[in-house]
Amino acid sequence: ELFHHGPEDVVISLIKFIGTMVILLNIHSGLALCAAASLPFMLVFAYVYNGKLKRAFKRNRDRIADINAQLEDSLSGVRVVKSFGNEDAEMGKFQSGNNAFLESKKSAYKIMGIYNSGMGVFTTLVTIVVVVAGAVFLTNKTLEVADLVTFMLYINNFTDPIKRLVSFTE
């Protein structure tokens, strides 16, 4: 799935982003630069939290591997465990491994929530910056209302490829 849709998504997103940026620059270059000003912050945020997500998901895989290894050992030695009456000890080991997996899963979901919320904040911030800068440009009479409306309609075409590229790296 990744090899089929991945390169396609990257190419489409890059073309859409570059094309939209060219259109926005033609509508009003100052407003386009204001919209693009948040990109470095968004990319740094995405890079940092993408790394945290990868580490959290690796911890999840490690914890589930620990549980599977312990289960395999327990099942292969079930007669020995029963003969020595160690069922409670084995259940305790399983519960301990299960709790470690649960905690790593909670941590991963927390990081994922912060990451997705943060990306939402940055994309909303682009819209807010455009509205505020547009108001300033309207006040200075360097921007027409029709251009601001057109610009606002293109903003989603500007932020959607960024969100798609960032989610691709997840």
Please tell me what each predicted stretch does.
Residues 9, 13, 39-43, 120:
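Residue-level recognition of pore/gate-forming positions within transmembrane alpha-helices
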Residues 15-20, 131:
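Hydrophobic, membrane-inserted alpha-helices
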Residues 1-3, 7, 52-69, 73, ...:
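An intracellular "coupling" helix at the cytosolic face of ABC transporter transmembrane type-1 domains
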Residues 9, 21-29, 51-59, 85, ...:
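Transmembrane helix-loop junctions in multipass membrane proteins, especially transporters and channels
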